[in-house]
Amino acid sequence: MKVRPSVKPMCEHCKIIKRQGRVMVICSANPKHKQRQG
């Protein structure tokens, strides 16, 4: 999980979601693309 000031989708499988007030990116194809804003 990468923590970044700005999260962007890295590939076509990345989805931007909101969990507990935090913006996150989850990726079904590549788990390395997981990101959290903060």
Curated annotation (Swiss-Prot):
Protein name: Large ribosomal subunit protein bL36
Keyword Ribonucleoprotein annotated: yes
Species this chain originates from: Lactobacillus johnsonii (strain CNCM I-12250 / La1 / NCC 533)
Domain of life, source organism: Bacteria
Family indicated by similarity: Belongs to the bacterial ribosomal protein bL36 family.
GO biological process, one term: translation
Cellular component, GO annotation: cytoplasm; ribonucleoprotein complex; ribosome
A Pfam family it matches: Ribosomal_L36
GO molecular function, one term: structural constituent of ribosome
HAMAP family: Ribosomal_bL36
Keywords: Ribonucleoprotein, Ribosomal protein
